Every structure is written in C-alpha cells, then in structure tokens.
C-alpha cells in the first residue's frame, strides 16, 4: 500500500510538472483573423520589436541590459521629438508585427497565392542560414527553425503580393505609362566605378590631402565627359568608360598604386529616392546625383574610404521597361503595400490570449550571445 501511495504521489508530481511546462510556453497566443499565432512566431515578433527599439537607443543606453532598457525612454521620431517608454514601444511593435504577418498570409490566400517549390526551398535555405549564423541567440529566445521557416515564407509572400496587387495582371495593375513616368521622374539609373581611397596592395589609407587630390582628378575626368555629351545611352556609356580608364592610373598613382585590369569595369544601379539617400550618405552627394541629367557624369565622395565616378543615363534608353519593371514597381508601390497590409491587419478580428502572452514577457528576452 505504501509503495502504491508513493507511486501515486510521484505520478501526481509528474503531472503537475508537465502542466507547469505547458503553461510556461503556450502552443499558441491566439489568432488574428483566421491566422493562428504560435508561441514561436509571437516570440520572434517580440524579439524583432525589441531590436527595433535597440536601434533607437542613445549612446548612453545599453540594450543588452534588457530589464533596465525596457524602463528607459527612447526617441521614436527625430522630426517631432516623439518619445516612448521602451516596454510600451516593444508591446505596440510586437502587435503590429503580428498584424502584418496575419495580413500578409490572409491577403495572399485571398488572391489565390501559392508558393512555388523553389520559393519554399529558398525560404528553408534562408531560415537555415539564419539559424547557422545566430542559432544560439534564437534558441535562447524560444525561436526555433520551424518558426524561422514560416517567417521566411511570410517574407516571400509579401514580395509576391506586390505583383499580385499591382503587377500587370494584379488586383490594381499599374500601367506601363505610370511605371515609365516613375522611372524617368523619381528614379536614377547610373553606371559607375568605385575607387578605393587606399592602396589596394599595402592598404595604406589616403590622408585628407590625398583624398582631395584623388577626388579632384576624378571630377576633372567627369567634367571632360560633360564637355561634349553624345546622344544615346550607349555612346554616353562608351565615352564615360573611356574617361574612367584614362583617369584611373593617375588617381591610383596618388597612393603609389596601380588599377587592376578590371578596375574600370562599370557596374549598374537603378536607385529610388530612399536608395539614393542610403547609398550616398556623405553630405550633399545624394542631391548632386539627383541633379544630374541623363548623359551627365560626376565624381563624388562615396564614403570615408571610397569615391565614385558615375554617369546618369535615361533608364529606358539604357535598358527595357520589362527588365526594370520589378524594381520600378517595388520603388513605386512598396510603401503603399506596407501601409495597406498594416491597416488590413489592424482591422482583422483579434482573438489574442493576454494570459498566454504574459507568460512570455519582453523582460525574458536575451539580447546577447
């Protein structure tokens, strides 16, 4: 009898322990619309929200100290000076992330979307790469490989929605005339070379005087192109390429270096307004690039360790609308799509379990490996 009693006590203790485990990590925190939100996806949304807050931390705030940082105040809008307590900001951003995930999956299904086998393979590959790079950190935050696979699928669905909503056969198609106007008026098509401000053999960096001398030589080459701009993107590219090839030996010689055999090979970029600002972060350079007319060349300080020689071209003279369609559509409509997704997600019925979410508070986030 005594043995049976002990066995019963042990069984009860085991049952209580199992219940405790299930309560500490719920399988799901509920639904938004008809989309189930597993605990792993909730934890990923919360972790991402925390990282967004961490990016807004001031120099004297340490986001690796989670408990204290959650109590801190951050500036969330430099233009208006709006501030927020980190814990409130993380909670709001977590909800917005979940609403976005649910909206993407719902809209994708509504429009008859189906991921291709290649897209699913790509999602799995990206998820595995993330786990290989930061697996310990993800695992410490309760985020497993299956969650990352689902998240990567959501990202691909979001990309597909751009075409499904605004593409040629989309729900609200953008006309070729609208795309053409956007390409010509709002985007900048360039061919360019990046010139390092250091000796590529010794890695000795240019001082201020040497950097200024190299930039002046590059600008002189650009001005020689602008003195007689030929007609057509092909001729403009050829003239620019010749000017670059002629100028590079003297530019590299400032640092006792020589250009490699492919140093004058031109790269191509199509930049939207946000891309231009991000690409040309040195003061005044983004505006200088925007001000160029098709066929005009320039040389600008690209970063603290490189300058860029570039020529702006008419995108539809240098390329075709079909080949530029995806980039132009993304630049034109990505912001609108994101706003509509966020609004759609906020309007979906919410059946989230606050008790379940409280079992996974932001205070348990691990923000260092």
PLM feature segments, named:
Residues 92-124, 161, 260, 269-273, ...:
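Extended amphipathic secondary-structure runs
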Residues 220-282:
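Peptidyl-prolyl cis-trans isomerase
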Residues 1-12:
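Positively charged n-region of N-terminal signal peptides that target proteins for export
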Residues 61-78, 201-223, 320-322:
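A solvent-exposed, charged loop/short amphipathic helix patch at secondary-structure junctions
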Residues 23-143:
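N-terminal targeting/tethering segments
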Residues 47-54, 95-116, 125-139, 143, ...:
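Sec-exported extracytoplasmic/periplasmic mature domains
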Residues 23-25, 32, 138-216, 276-369:
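PPIase-associated folding chaperone regions across multiple families
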Residues 16-20:
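C-terminal motif of bacterial Sec signal peptides marking the signal peptidase cleavage site
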């Amino acid at each position: 009898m005594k043995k049976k009693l002990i066995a019963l006590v042990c069984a009860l203790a085991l049952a209580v322990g199992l219940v405790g485990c299930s309560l500490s990590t719920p399988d799901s925190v509920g639904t938004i619309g008809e989309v189930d939100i597993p605990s792993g996806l909730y934890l990923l949304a919360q972790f991402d929200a925390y990282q967004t807050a961490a990016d807004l931390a001031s120099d004297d705030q340490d986001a690796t100290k989670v408990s204290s940082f959650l109590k801190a105040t951050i500036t969330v809008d430099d233009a208006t000076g709006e501030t927020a307590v980190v814990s409130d900001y993380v909670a709001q951003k977590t909800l917005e992330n979940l609403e976005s995930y649910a909206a993407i999956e719902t809209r994708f299904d509504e429009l008859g979307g189906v991921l291709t086998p290649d897209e699913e393979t790509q999602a799995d590959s990206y998820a595995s790469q993330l786990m290989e790079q930061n697996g310990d950190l993800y695992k410490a935050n309760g985020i497993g490989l299956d969650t990352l696979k689902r998240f990567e699928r959501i990202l691909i669905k979001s990309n597909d929605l751009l075409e499904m909503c605004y593409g040629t056969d989309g729900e609200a198609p953008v006309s070729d005339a609208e795309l053409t106007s956007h390409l010509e008026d709002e985007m900048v098509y360039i061919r360019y070379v990046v010139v390092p401000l250091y000796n590529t053999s010794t890695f000795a960096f240019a001082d201020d005087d040497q950097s200024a001398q190299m930039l002046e030589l590059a600008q002189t080459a650009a001005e020689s192109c602008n003195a007689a701009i030929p007609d057509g993107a092909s001729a403009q590219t050829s003239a620019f390429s010749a000017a670059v090839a002629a100028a590079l030996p003297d530019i590299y010689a400032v640092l006792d270096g020589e250009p490699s055999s492919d140093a004058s090979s031109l790269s191509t970029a199509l930049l939207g307004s946000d891309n231009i600002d991000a690409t040309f972060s040195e003061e005044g350079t983004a505006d200088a690039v925007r001000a160029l007319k098709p066929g005009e060349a320039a040389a600008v300080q690209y970063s603290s360790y490189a300058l860029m020689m570039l020529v702006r071209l008419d995108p539809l003279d240098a390329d075709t609308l079909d080949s530029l369609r995806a980039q132009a559509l993304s630049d034109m409509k990505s912001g609108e799509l994101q706003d509509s997704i966020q609004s759609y997600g906020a309007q979906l019925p919410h059946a989230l379990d606050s008790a379940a979410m409280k079992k996974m508070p932001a205070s348990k986030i691990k923000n260092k490996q």
